[in-house]
């Protein structure tokens, strides 16, 4: 009989739902395993075939671990705040909450159609007030500890959108969405002091088993570097420009100073003669985002302020310039330029005719920048020293002369935590008329987002919440008037702690019970896309460390193992996108081929961490394999749906003993190490051998069903029932292997004549030389060749070969 995937999949999905098959067990006698997917943003497009790749991998692990006797926590939820829902609401006049709920319903239907073993009793949604009550609570704790603060920050302001956009959303001075002009504008923003955790965020990467590439990206993003901070006095002003440098050895090569255009000293030190040029330059760059400004490939621009600084090591006058390649937010907002030995400084100096002063031997800076190592030259008391020795001598000199000190600097900036948007968590802060600020009292949390479909930009730069005056204005018991914070939190907020709420999702009194957190943390396996390597994974580690410091969580790190699945590309090898028309909808695949086929195919495409193109042919191949499995187990020439093949017998003639035990060992190890494609290859080897065997022992038939169940759960549940079992396969014991069965009793030996291969034969292991020699001579292909020749010599090596020398 043919396999009807639609009927079987519907049957077992209904069974799992009605029996709550995947409800998390919390048996104290069992070990715990927490398998976590990065929860999705429920977009209007629904699921695409890229989502199930990571979800299938965690599901395989979760299903295997249940069968191995673990308590398994395998939850799913929704990262549901965010810009697309708000944009949709602006465009259509509909409520983003309704739109979001509709999308969640679609996602949930699609996810369930793929047979994932989630415990839906633990579902979380970042837009649910019962959830974001605790997001707000964490913010308040950070505020109390001085880690949440307000600052005037230069942001990318889009008057047309009526909001601030992130650096990543600005392209050539315009917004990515809609192409509206962007201006740099200082605005009051909430910041989180992630820099206070910079060292721990680097050092504690040693505690986790993550891909080295992700660890490196985080280390580089934090950008810890050791150097010196040097003070340059401004000529004719009572002011100093502080500069951080990792190359204190090149102090004698400084030929000018460059400040960020936003540096606080620019207005004070610019001379009347240069004011027009400086003002024109400031106007020119106001559309540029930080990303564009620091693009190494772009042409260097700048303006001379007319002022000079004094080099503290030799008293030389250094012209002070401004240029947009220096950012006010990085380091001190000013750099000392050593154009002979730094590519950006060299380009700038060449463009504006500034002097080049070589201080490292070798190279010709007039022709090209010289960055190779050498010894110090033109550097007074540093001459003849190598780089490190010169740094080690210069820093104490700077300290002694009170013009500098040793300093550790970080590329990491504090986290800009506010958005001028409606569809986000309200920040639980009240600004009072007397100039003070307070948090919303804890017993009044959550501070709920007022539901409205009238979401339009305020026009002032504030979020649309500024329009909702009933919500906005408050009065305390003493009659003091106040105004709620109108900024909302960024989409990163809820995702920075959601994995904790899954552990205790209904707790009204705590973010989560500490003993439960102790039972389940750290997360054993976290799977998601590599695009989150820095932002999400850095933010979540920062929040976790803060919660550890205040005694809310028991571990220093949230996730023990991290795995980044690759990307599924369109069949034209490009990223799937609606605009390219190459998006594959999983609903279509499930309808035509079945969920088990989709799961099997996505795990068999290649290594889980590789980016691979979608192939209809590969999908058909996966279905073909499942059909072969089905035919092996079922009686073909009957219409009855539960007729087991007569090939499946109680007796075991050991024909499949070795390959079965090899398969159990290999599949178990490959599942553990996420090598699912290799595991599937071994399952295919077993099925091929089972077809060739005379009978299929029930013991192995049942064992194989257990091995394939985590990948193809619907078909395997059906076969398990056909094998006579009343209960679901979800909690039956995982197969074990017999190590003795892996030892080969037979080996392949080759027979040669005069070094040329004549035959390959299978013989008993450790067959003695004399017997091997006799077998070789008796072999018809060998005998035919030596019939009319004299055998001069026979070389027999047990378990390997027999070579007969004859002429």
Swiss-Prot record:
This is Leucine--tRNA ligase. A motif ('KMSKS' region) lies at residues 575-579. NCBIfam families: leuS_bact. Keywords: Aminoacyl-tRNA synthetase, ATP-binding, Cytoplasm, Ligase, Nucleotide-binding, Protein biosynthesis. GO terms for cellular component: cytosol. Belongs to the class-I aminoacyl-tRNA synthetase family. A motif ('HIGH' region) lies at residues 40-51. ATP binds at residue 578. It is found in: Cytoplasm. It catalyses: tRNA(Leu) + L-leucine + ATP = L-leucyl-tRNA(Leu) + AMP + diphosphate. It is an enzyme of class 6 (ligase). GO terms for biological process: leucyl-tRNA aminoacylation. InterPro entries: aa-tRNA-synth_I_CS, aa-tRNA-synth_Ia, Leu-tRNA-ligase, Leu_tRNA-synth_edit, M/V/L/I-tRNA-synth_anticd-bd, Methionyl/Leucyl_tRNA_Synth, Rossmann-like_a/b/a_fold, tRNAsynth_Ia_anticodon-bd. The keyword Protein biosynthesis applies.
């Amino acid at each position: 009989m043919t396999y009807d995937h639609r009927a079987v999949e519907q049957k077992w999905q209904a069974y799992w739902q009605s029996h709550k098959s995947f409800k998390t067990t919390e048996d104290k006698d069992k070990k715990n395993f927490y398998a976590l997917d990065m929860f999705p943003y429920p977009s209007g497009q629904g699921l695409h075939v890229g989502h199930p790749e990571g979800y299938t991998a965690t599901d395989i692990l979760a299903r295997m671990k249940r069968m191995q006797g673990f308590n398994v926590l395998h939850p799913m939820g929704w990262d549901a705040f965010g810009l697309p829902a708000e944009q949709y609401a602006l465009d259509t006049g509909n409520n983003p909450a309704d739109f979001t709920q509709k999308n969640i319903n679609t996602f949930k239907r699609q996810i369930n159609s793929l047979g994932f073993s989630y415990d839906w009793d633990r579902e979380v949604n970042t837009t649910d007030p019962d959830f974001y009550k605790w997001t707000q609570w964490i913010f308040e704790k950070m505020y109390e500890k001085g880690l949440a603060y307000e600052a005037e920050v230069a942001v990318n302001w889009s008057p047309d959108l009526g909001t601030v956009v992130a650096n990543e959303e600005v392209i050539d001075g315009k917004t990515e969405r809609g192409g509206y002009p962007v201006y740099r504008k200082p605005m009051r923003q909430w910041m989180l002091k992630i820099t206070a955790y910079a060292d721990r965020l680097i050092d504690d990467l040693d505690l986790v088993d993550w891909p080295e590439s992700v660890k490196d990206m985080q280390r580089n993003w934090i950008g810890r570097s050791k150097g010196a901070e040097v003070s340059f006095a401004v000529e004719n002003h009572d002011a100093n420009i502080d500069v951080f440098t990792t190359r204190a050895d090149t102090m004698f090569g400084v030929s000018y100073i460059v400040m960020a255009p936003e540096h606080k000293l620019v207005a004070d030190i610019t001379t009347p003669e240069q004011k027009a040029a400086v003002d024109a330059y400031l106007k020119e760059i106001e559309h540029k985002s930080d990303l564009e400004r620091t693009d190494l490939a772009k042409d260097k621009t700048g303006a001379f302020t007319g002022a000079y600084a004094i080099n503290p090591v030799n008293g030389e006058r250094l012209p002070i310039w401004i240029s947009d390649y220096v950012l006010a937010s990085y380091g001190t907002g000013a750099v000392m330029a050593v154009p002979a030995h730094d590519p950006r400084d060299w380009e700038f100096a060449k463009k504006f005719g500034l002097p080049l002063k070589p201080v490292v031997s070798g190279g010709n800076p007039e022709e090209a920048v010289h960055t190779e190592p050498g010894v110090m030259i033109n550097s007074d008391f540093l001459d003849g020293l190598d780089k490190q020795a010169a740094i080690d001598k210069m820093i104490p000199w700077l300290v002694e002369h009170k013009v500098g000190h040793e300093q550790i600097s970080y590329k990491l900036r504090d986290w800009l935590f506010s958005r001028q948007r409606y569809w986000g968590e309200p920040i639980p802060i009240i600004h009072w008329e007397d100039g003070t600020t307070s948090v919303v009292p804890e017993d009044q949390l959550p501070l709920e987002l007022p539901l409205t479909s009238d979401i339009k930009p305020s026009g002032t730069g504030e979020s649309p919440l500024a329009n909702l005056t009933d919500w906005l204005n408050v009065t305390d018991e003493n009659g003091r008037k106040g105004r709620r914070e109108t900024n909302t939190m960024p989409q990163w907020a809820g995702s920075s702690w959601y994995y904790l709420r899954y552990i205790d999702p209904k707790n009204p009194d705590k973010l989560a019970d500490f003993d439960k957190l102790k039972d389940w943390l750290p997360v054993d396996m976290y799977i998601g896309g590599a695009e989150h390597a820095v932002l999400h994974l850095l933010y979540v580690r920062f929040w976790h460390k803060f919660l550890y410091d205040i005694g809310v969580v028991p571990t220093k790190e949230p996730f023990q193992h991290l795995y980044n699945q690759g990307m599924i590309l369109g069949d034209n090898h490009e990223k799937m996108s609606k605009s390219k028309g190459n998006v594959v909808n999983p609903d279509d695949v499930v309808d035509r081929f079945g969920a088990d086929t989709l799961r099997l195919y996505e795990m068999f495409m290649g290594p889980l961490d590789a980016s691979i193109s979608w192939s209809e042919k590969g999908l058909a191949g996966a279905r073909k394999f499942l059909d072969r499995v089905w035919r092996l187990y079922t009686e073909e020439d009957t219409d009855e749906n539960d007729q087991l093949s007569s090939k499946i017998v109680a007796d075991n003639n050991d024909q499949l003993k070795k390959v079965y035990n090899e398969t159990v060992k290999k599949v178990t190890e490959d599942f553990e190490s996420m090598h699912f494609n290799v595991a599937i290859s071994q399952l295919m080897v077993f099925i091929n051998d089972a077809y060739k065997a005379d009978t299929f022992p029930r013991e192995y038939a049942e064992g194989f069903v257990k091995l394939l169940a985590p990948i193809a759960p619907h078909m395997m549940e059906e076969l398990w029932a056909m094998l006579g079992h009343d209960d679901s396969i979800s909690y039956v014991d995982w197969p074990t292997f017999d190590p003795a069965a892996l030892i080969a009793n037979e080996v392949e030996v080759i027979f040669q004549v005069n070094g040329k291969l004549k035959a390959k034969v299978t013989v008993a292991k450790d067959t003695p030389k004399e017997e091997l020699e006799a077998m070789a001579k008796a072999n018809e292909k060998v005998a035919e060749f030596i019939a009319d020749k004299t055998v001069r010599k026979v070389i027999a090596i047990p378990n390997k070969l027999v070579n007969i020398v004859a002429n």
